[in-house]
């Protein structure tokens, strides 16, 4: 079992890249479902994209030591990875894919060391990222401004990752990342 960690600013296309990679059966990937205290967006379902819990329940699980990593990503919105989720996917003999915020990604890379490939997906520019976030129509202008400010900071952290890939074109990005993963899995 190997670990592939993806981190990126919100709106970079991380979920789309991961969705395409999971279709490539030769990579033997399984998606680690994170737990969050935020409300579901759009068509998100509990146990598919995330495990949705209250902030109180999340804090209870933190105190119980249930998470291998966790962060308060936005005020009052917690994200984390249950240790039991890694055990579940490991038992299936899969390579595990994580979709984490920047600090969660850095922490997981430190935890797993050479067993993990940490990939930072970067938008072509902050202007393009703003357009993508506006097109998504899930956030207020204030929330988009907050996400752009956070993205600038996250991009500064990219050097902590093994590889940085710019997502300017989904198919090109997916192929580039698939090659990185194949190379990692074969070593």
Locations of regions flagged by a protein language model:
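Post-Walker A alpha-helix
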Residues: 18-19
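ATP-dependent small-molecule kinase phosphotransfer cores
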Residues: 36-96, 102-106
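P-loop (Walker A) phosphate-binding loop of NTP-binding proteins
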Residues: 7-9
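Walker A/P-loop
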Residues: 15
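NTP-dependent small-molecule kinase module
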Residues: 131, 135-139, 153-187
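ATP-binding Walker
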Residues: 12
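Conserved phosphate-donor/acceptor-positioning beta-strand/loop module used by diverse small-molecule
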Residues: 97-101, 111-135
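Post-Walker A helix-loop "phosphate-sensing" segment adjacent to the P-loop in P-loop NTPases
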Residues: 23-31
């Amino acid at each position: 079992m190997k670990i592939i960690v993806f981190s990126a600013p919100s709106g970079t296309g991380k979920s789309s890249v991961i969705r395409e990679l999971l279709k490539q059966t030769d990579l033997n990937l399984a998606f680690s479902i994170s737990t969050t205290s935020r409300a579901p967006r759009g068509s998100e379902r509990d146990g598919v994209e995330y495990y949705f819990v209250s902030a109180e329940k999340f804090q209870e699980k933190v105190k119980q030591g249930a998470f291998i990593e966790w962060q308060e990503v936005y005020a009052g919105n917690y994200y984390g990875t249950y240790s039991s989720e890694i055990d579940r996917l490991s038992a299936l003999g899969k390579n595990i894919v994580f979709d984490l915020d920047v600090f969660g990604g850095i922490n997981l890379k430190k935890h797993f060391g050479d067993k993990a490939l940490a990939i930072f997906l970067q938008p072509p520019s902050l202007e393009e990222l703003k357009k993508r976030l506006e097109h998504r129509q899930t956030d207020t202008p204030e929330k988009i401004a907050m996400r752009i400010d956070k993205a600038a900071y996250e991009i500064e952290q990219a050097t902590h990752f093994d590889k940085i890939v710019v997502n300017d074109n989904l198919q090109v990005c997916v192929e580039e990342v698939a090659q990185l993963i194949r190379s990692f899995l074969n070593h």
